[in-house]
Amino acid sequence: TRRSSDLYQKRNETNELFIPPGARLGDKVLEVSNLRKSYGDRVLIDDLSFSVPKGAIVGIIGPNGAGKSTLFRMMSGQEQPDSGTITLGETVKLASVDQFRDAMDNSKTVWEEVSGGLDIMKIGNTEMPSRAYVGRFNFKGVDQGKRVGELSGGERGRLHLAKLLQVGGNVLLLDEPTNDLDIETLRALENALLEFPGCAMVISHDRWFLD
């Protein structure tokens, strides 16, 4: 029937998400040694050590306030640990996606918000037409002309990913990337991560997604 055909086409259209590949990773990716971080008397992270091998997808779970986002901020250099070390490999380029989606201009169109008005965008180390890049996040045709303020939660989530992934990192730090995403976009993100040639660290309360 026409309805089932339309639904099938819509499902196919939303079953795509593009994570731009970064430069090839070397053998050393990330090593954390004896990390400690506290705020006043409250210790968030105490003597944490781990390493991330090439090609790994690492899930980070824990209750709210446990220091998961703080760990990401230390890894990206936004905060400093009280003690311990975080060592990134020489080939590592981080791409961070935080959980805060308010820093977008509601008066701009989807295309303007991602492209800055440029017809050609630098995506990692390559260039591509901006409308093609935005389209890889399931904003097709007229959807690219939607105002940011009119978007649903799931659409804002896709827009957020499109903005922050364009740096073309080879190690992704994804903080609650599944918030507000619909089931088809969740599956598309899962597939994109599995196909991503670099590493990813994912903070999520969504155990189904992490599994």
Each language-model region and where it sits:
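ABC-family P-loop ATPase nucleotide-binding domain
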Residues: 7-31
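Short, small-residue-biased leader/transition segments that mark boundaries at the very start
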Residues: 1-4
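ABC ATP-binding cassette signature C-motif
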Residues: 22-211
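Short secondary-structure junctions and interdomain/linker hinges
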Residues: 6-7, 121
